[in-house]
Amino acid sequence: MASLLRPTPLLSTPRKLTHSHLHTSISFPFQISTQRKPQKHLLNLCRSTPTPSQQKASQRKRTRYRKQYPGENIGITEEMRFVAMRLRNVNGKKLDLSEDKTDTEKEEEEEEEDDDDDDEVKEETWKPSKEGFLKYLVDSKLVFDTIERIVDESENVSYAYFRRTGLERCESIEKDLQWLREQDLVIPEPSNVGVSYAKYLEEQAGESAPLFLSHFYSIYFSHIAGGQVLVRQVSEKLLEGKELEFNRWEGDAQDLLKGVREKLNVLGEHWSRDEKNKCLKETAKAFKYMGQIVRLIIL
């Protein structure tokens, strides 16, 4: 009973946990930071759809300019002249593909080539005949008559600019043929070469003014640049140096040709690049036909 009556010991009052006690009694293996770590944000500048300014810049980068044809910056007749010179050099085996030479050097070389050509003639590398020269004059008359008649009679406005240029040769050649008849020489009929070329000129005149005019200019250019020299040399050999009407103009031939050249260049400004390229091909054909007619002199 005594044990039962023994007073039960009072439980000790629990200690009040203060903030400091709580802090020391609770621990973690790591620290929790309430501050966020700074993050690096990258701006994605690549857009799936380009802006208008970016599109324009991209288009400018892709623009490629084609290489100009020789003489294109001056006019279509200058392009034709380059074709003629290239044909002349190839046929004479004097082709030079170098583009690094100055204009002065090229002019000096051209003058040297002209001197070489004169030397070749003086050395009698070819022997003309009266019969062949008559064929040449007859075919030349047919060709000049064809182009002059076309520009006079055609209703094409482009051809009207080339009427009465002062370069006309048909009547002049007819006077020479009449004089040769008086020398008891028989005037032949036009050869197949002249007839074929005249027919071709008629076809081109009906199909395309630019193509026909490339022949028109090339024919006069050919005679003034080299044909008249050839006629004079043949006359010295066969006709005692008589000055033929074929080589006489009322005015300076170069000035007259310049007038035609300027008109053709103005028209050429309205032609497409494709039309101009076709004109250059026709220029080569024109010199091919004229070369065949010249060769009649020695056949």
Curated annotation (Swiss-Prot):
Keyword set includes Transit peptide: yes
Transit peptide: 1-83
Organism from which the protein derives: Arabidopsis thaliana
UniProt entry tagged with the keyword Plastid: yes
Region (Disordered): 1-20, 45-70, 96-126
Subcellular localization: Plastid, Chloroplast
InterPro entries, per the entry: Haem_Oase (IPR002051), Haem_Oase-like (IPR016053), Haem_Oase-like_multi-hlx (IPR016084), Haem_Oase_decyc_pln (IPR016951)
Gene deletion effect: Slight reduction in plant size and chlorophyll content, and early flowering.
Family the entry assigns: Belongs to the heme oxygenase family.
Entry protein name: Probable inactive heme oxygenase 2, chloroplastic
Tissue and organ expression note: Widely expressed at low levels.
Superkingdom of source: Eukaryota
CDD domains: HemeO
UniProt GO molecular function: heme oxygenase (decyclizing) activity
The protein's role, per its UniProt record: Probable inactive heme oxygenase. Binds protoporphyrin IX, a precursor for both heme and chlorophyll biosynthesis. Plays a minor role in phytochrome assembly and photomorphogenesis.
Any one GO biological process: photosynthesis
